[in-house]
Each structure stands twice: as C-alpha cells, then as structure tokens.
C-alpha cells in the first residue's frame, strides 16, 4: 500500500485523518512519512498544529525514501511557520545506516529538533541488530550517541530492566501505541518501568494505516486493559495520568505546546 501512495492520495487522506484527531480532542499531531509538504498544507488549512518530517528509509529492497539532506531542507522551510514544526524522521536502527543516524543526531543537536524513530518494536528487529552490529537497539543507540539527543522512540517494547536504567540516564520520549503493536503479535511494553524511572511516556495512535483509526481516547482504553493484563492488576495503571502526560509532556517534546498525538 505504501508503494502506491502519491501526492493526490496523501492530500485527499490527510484532512480526513486530521478531522478524526480533532474529534477526539487532539490539536497537535506528529507525522513521519512521505509527502510531508502535503501534510503541512492540510494542517494549515484545517488550523491545527503539526510536527512533521520526511521519513528516511535506506536499508530495504527498493529505492530509498528521502535523505538527511532532503529532511534538512524541509525543516528549514518550516522555521518561520506558526503552526507546523519540523522533526527528524529516521525510520529505525534497522532500516537506516549508522552514518545517517549520526548525521541526524548532529542536525538534531544543532537545530534543536527531535529525532523520531521506531525502536525495539519486534523480536525480528532485536535479532537483526544483533546479527548486524552485535548489539540490542538500546546498546546500539547508546553506542552511537543517539540517546544524547533525547529522541522520540515509538513503541519500545523489547527493552530489558538493565536497558531501562540506560534509558533513564538520557530520558528519551517513549511513544506507546498499544493497539497496533499488539495486533502485530508483539509484546506488551512495561510502561510502569519507564514511568517509575522518570522516562516520559506519551500515548500514540500509530496511524490509520496500521491501527485502522486515530482516536487517542481509544488508545487510552486499550492501554488501561493491556497494562492491567501485563501486571495482573487492573488498578496498576492510571489512565488519567497517561492522558495528562500525553498532553503536557508530549506537546512540550515537539516544541509547539500542548495537545500532542502521534
């Protein structure tokens, strides 16, 4: 489906997705994909805030999708925009070269923009990174200096207790997208271990392509059920705190204020 996307598809679909976000109370969203100039246009026309980036994907079969240079130019075009701000969207440690991630980290520190990436989301990723680099995602991110940028890490399901301690030193932002990741057969992230260590956790919807909808209130309901199951205690997780943090902490992480949804 991704290979079939073109500019017209994106422009027709973005207002629908943004409208669904607004209906569930979201006034600021993040998106890392293709044709993000179209996403920016749609956000301006509707009047919501957005934090956007082209998605850099290099290590897969087919032509690469965008580059760090393209991403930099896109971010520069948004510097004076009152509604739309740039992100640095490198897809993942398994689909982008180490060199590009290091360049993205330099750009992040120099421009004050967050890196966004998928992180520790599947057992296949863990296996691939061990085979390629001899390290887990957390070990790899620490080794190359990625964690110093305090990136936005989507999912972060397969992280050991020892690695949570490593993350706690840097306090990256964790995007928790429960419905999508569980529907793929991946595990349930131990969100309380992050929260207890002071690592900011933000609710996300992932996308209409993978989740089927983008309703942050639905994701809060799934989070409550999933975390209750994970810890075998239905009152273990506070959904009100999760929503509150998603608004306050999430909005601040983007540099555009309150009202975040990924």
Residue ranges and their predicted role:
Residues 38-157:
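Metal-coordinating catalytic core of metallo-dependent amide/deamination hydrolases
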Residues 143-150, 192-262:
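His/Asp/Glu-enriched, well-ordered alpha-helical/loop segment
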Residues 19, 41, 102, 106, ...:
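Alpha-helical segments flanking ligand/cofactor-binding loops in enzyme cores
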Residues 121-145, 149-169, 182-193, 207-218:
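Catalytic core of soluble alpha/beta enzymes
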Residues 29-30, 51, 116, 152-154, ...:
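Structural detector of well-ordered beta-strand residues that form the stable sheet scaffold
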Residues 25, 43, 88, 118, ...:
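Divalent metal-coordination and catalytic microenvironments
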Residues 24-26, 48, 112, 171-172:
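A structural motif
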Residues 1-47, 70-80:
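Alpha-helical scaffold segments that flank or form the walls of functional sites
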């Amino acid at each position: 489906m991704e290979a079939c996307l073109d500019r017209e598809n994106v422009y027709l679909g973005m207002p629908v997705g943004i409208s669904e976000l607004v209906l569930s109370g979201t006034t600021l969203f993040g998106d890392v994909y293709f044709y993000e100039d179209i996403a920016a246009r749609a956000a301006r026309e509707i009047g919501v805030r957005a934090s956007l980036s082209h998605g850099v994907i290099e290590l897969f079969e087919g032509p690469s999708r965008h580059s760090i240079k393209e991403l930099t130019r896109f971010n520069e075009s948004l510097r004076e925009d009152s509604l739309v701000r740039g992100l640095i969207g490198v897809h993942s440690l398994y689909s982008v070269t180490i060199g590009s991630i290091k360049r993205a980290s330099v750009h992040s520190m120099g421009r004050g923009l967050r890196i966004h990436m998928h992180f520790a989301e599947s057992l296949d990723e863990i296996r691939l990174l061990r085979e390629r680099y001899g390290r887990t995602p957390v070990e790899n991110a620490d080794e190359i200096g990625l964690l110093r940028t305090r990136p936005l890490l989507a999912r972060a399901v397969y992280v050991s207790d020892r690695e949570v301690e490593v993350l706690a030193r840097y306090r990256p932002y964790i995007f928790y997208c429960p419905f999508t990741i569980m529907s793929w057969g991946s595990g349930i992230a131990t969100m309380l271990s992050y929260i207890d260590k002071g690592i900011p956790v933000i609710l996300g919807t992932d996308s209409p392509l993978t989740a089927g909808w983008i309703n942050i209130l639905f994701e809060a309901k799934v989070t409550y059920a999933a975390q209750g199951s994970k810890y075998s205690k239905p009152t273990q997780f506070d959904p009100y705190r999760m929503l509150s943090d998603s608004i306050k902490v999430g909005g601040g992480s983007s540099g555009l204020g309150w009202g975040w949804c990924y």
